[in-house]
Amino acid sequence: MLTLENLSFGVQDEKSQKEIIRNLNLTIESNKFVVVTGPNGGGKSTLAKLIAGIEKPTGGRIQLDGVDITEKNITERAQSGISYAFQQPVRFKGIEVFDLLRLASGKQLTITDACQYLSEVGLCAKDYIKREVNDSLSGGELKRIEIATVLARGTKLSI
């Protein structure tokens, strides 16, 4: 379960402090799929970065399964079971989709397991498993492959 208590984040510009997120309270139960929507510049990406540990809140607390992770860095949060998929998927020249999934899983991964992850994100595994992760893939294909790597990690919380 993820709990945000009075979470705030602000940035200093040349004149004043600008609050991006102010006193947000939110609880997300385990094994739930939640979508955060809002206008451009509304703080959605900032919220994701705060949870992942890429940004530090200016106030409030973040708890994962009852453990306060507010002061943990991005590596410690990843070790706690939080994974983060970037808005723009990373391209890896010279690495095939299967190898990327194997690296993401952190364990020996069979072709069958890798194909299952690709199928779960709507890709025909036989068409992608041996493809190189490069500019030949569309943005949508790359995003699906990135989500498959998040699934392969088997984390508690995927952002």
Report residues per predicted region.
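ABC ATPase NBD coupling module
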Residues: D68-S83
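Conserved structural motif at the start of ABC-family nucleotide-binding domains
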Residues: L2, E19-N23
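Hydrophobic anchor residue at the start of the ABC signature
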Residues: I147
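The feature captures the beta-strand-to-loop junction immediately N-terminal to the Walker
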Residues: T37-P39
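Helix-to-loop junction immediately C-terminal to a conserved catalytic motif
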Residues: A52
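Conserved ABC transporter NBD signature motif
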Residues: G60-V67, S80, D113
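Q-loop/switch helix immediately C-terminal to the Walker
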Residues: Q88, G94-D113
